[in-house]
A protein has these predicted regions:
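Short, small-residue-biased leader/transition segments that mark boundaries at the very start
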Residues: 2-10
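Solvent-exposed, polar/charged alpha-helical surfaces in well-ordered, non-transmembrane soluble domains
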Residues: 7, 22, 43, 55, ...
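Ligand-binding clamshell of periplasmic/extracellular solute-binding protein-like
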Residues: 13-18, 35-39, 178-192
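Soluble non-cytosolic domains of exported or imported proteins
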Residues: 14-15, 51-56, 64-65, 99-106, ...
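Ligand/substrate-recognition segments at binding pockets and active sites
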Residues: 16, 91, 113-186, 229, ...
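Periplasmic-binding protein-like
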Residues: 17-26, 48, 52-91, 137, ...
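Short, solvent-exposed loop/beta-turn-alpha elements that line the ligand-binding surface or hinge
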Residues: 22-37, 44-55, 89-107, 117, ...
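Structural transition elements
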Residues: 81-114, 132-140
Length: 284
């Protein structure tokens, strides 16, 4: 790596494993810039499958999920934000009234009983075989969720597979749950909501929750057609309230993005988008 050589080097968009950032920061020859990335890791719940079509069941699974422990084990303390909405707080229309439910195993079990879900019901989670920006350790993540759901009487079967196979099978709706994520490339809410949660994407896209909510769809369709930023923002806030009430995902994390560089580099500004701007970058 050029980071350990003598030349000027910038390693852009470093999504570290939990132990990477402290070691880079501790190196006297290096420095690290960081910012919130346009990234969300989440678990999509197949709303067209038995049991998961019931919002009470989706709420129960969400209540059983130990988010704080999950992201600290996966990303390390301070390297990711707890996700609430489908996109991070830096994106327009972030609904700050939305909340993840507090972890409550008793209430989760009660919701499952109310929905008629038998003790010991089996669900299958698809996850990838290698880590990435949205989840550095998919197997550990799956095992932690498996342990969480066992506490409310759900047996989670884990299916680990290649990324391409996982996406193909998830598009076919073969999963109950799928652990995945999304990296936005322009900072607009539509760049998250239409590909991941629209009715069209439920039919033939990347809406792995296979969730089609007419109220939500009408709001994001209108927001795409509105020019005024304040009106757009209000529409997205309303759309996210619908999303929050219906719980098609278990949101996990918004990982931070890190850029490592040698200490002789000055003036470089990290960007959450795909472009690099070296106009103000100097080597001293």
């Amino acid at each position: 790596s050029c980071l350990v050589g003598s030349e000027m080097c910038i390693r852009d968009r470093l999504y570290p494993k939990p132990d990477d950032v402290p070691s880079i920061k501790a190196d006297p020859m290096l420095k690290v810039a960081e910012m919130e990335a346009l990234v969300t890791g989440y678990i999509a719940l197949n709303t067209q499958h038995r049991y998961l079509s019931d919002v009470r069941v989706r709420q129960a699974l969400d209540m059983a999920f130990d988010r704080q422990t999950h992201i600290e084990q996966l990303f390390g303390r301070g390297n990711a934000l707890l996700a609430v909405n489908p996109y991070p707080p830096t994106v327009m229309g972030y609904n700050r009234d939305n909340r993840n439910p507090p972890r409550d195993l008793d209430k989760a079990r009660a919701l499952l009983r109310e929905a008629g879900v038998p003790e010991g019901t089996e669900l299958t989670l698809f996850t990838r075989n290698g880590g990435g920006p949205t989840n550095p350790n998919p197997r550990l993540s799956a095992e932690m969720l498996q342990s969480d759901l066992a506490k409310i009487g759900i047996k989670l079967n884990i299916r680990v597979m290649e990324w391409a196979e996982m996406l193909r099978r998830a598009k076919n709706g073969e999963h109950d749950l799928v652990s995945t994520g999304w990296a936005g490339d322009n900072g607009d809410p539509d760049n998250f909501l239409t590909p991941l949660l629209s009715c069209e994407a439920a039919r033939n896209g990347e809406n792995y929750a296979r969730w089609c909510n007419k109220t939500f769809q009408a709001l994001i369709t209108e927001a795409r057609q509105v020019i005024d930023p304040q009106q757009r923002e209000a529409l997205y806030i309303r759309a996210l309230a619908v999303y929050d009430a219906d719980r098609p995902w278990i949101t996990m994390a918004h990982p931070k993005m890190f850029t490592a560089m040698r200490r002789n580099v000055e003036g470089y500004t990290i960007s959450p988008l795909t472009n690099n701007n070296f106009a103000t970058t100097l080597v001293k």
